[in-house]
Amino acid sequence: MEFLERSNVFGDPKSANVFLQPVDAQDLSRMEEETESLKALCGHEDWCILAVPVANWNRDLTPWSAPPVFGKEGFGEGAAASLDRILKVIIPSLEAAYPARRYFLAGYSLAGLFALWAGYQSATFAGVAAVSPSVWYPGWSDWAAGHVIRTPRVYLSLGDREEKTRNPLMSQVGACIRRQETMLQQHGTDVTLEWNPGNHFVDPAMRTAKGIAWLLR
């Protein structure tokens, strides 16, 4: 497991409950806060979080191209390659060390969108925590309406002020996540939608911990 740096593993590495969480440098700096919050919420440490570094956030977590929302950097279509690495490299390496585990995906913002999209692509995951996910992403809601998710459990959350933005695309996030919840309910998915206080940038570590804790119930 040469890709598996000790600094990127949190919790019990031998646990049967493994959460794969795509992260950038800022997310990684908050992992200790996230895991301490998770310990407090769960009351146990029967879980392992593997923080999976993402080289290019806008490219590697999105399923198709889209124009920029802020600045000049648009979005790529690298989600398929990122998922392929998780399924064909990371999980087999973990299984070789400690087999018969349950694998989950968790992510914040665009990583939350990636986790949700991956749940439609593969039945490998026992659950997905899409925390403040970028479901405003162009074409996402219509795409999701035409597909059936393959993971049995989904945690959704959003800040109660996230839709109160001047950006016309991002202001749709509230309507989009409500629609997402309804679609999953109609497909018989075990889904919950939790509203957190604040905008997109409030308490990401605690919000992510709450999603993981729900999946551990």
Stretch-by-stretch model annotation:
Residues 124-138:
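A conserved short beta-strand
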Residues 53, 108, 131-132, 157, ...:
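Alpha/beta-hydrolase-fold catalytic nucleophile elbow
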Residues 10-97:
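Serine-hydrolase catalytic machinery in alpha/beta-hydrolase-like enzymes
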Residues 117-121:
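Active-site signature of alpha/beta-hydrolase-fold catalytic machinery across serine-
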Residues 106-111, 115:
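Gly/Ala-rich beta-loop-alpha elbow adjacent to hydrolase catalytic centers
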Residues 135-215:
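The feature captures the conserved acid-bearing segment of alpha/beta-hydrolase catalytic domains
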Residues 20-24, 132, 158:
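The conserved beta1-alpha1 loop
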Residues 1-12:
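A short loop-to-beta-strand scaffold at the N-terminal edge of the catalytic core in hydrolase folds
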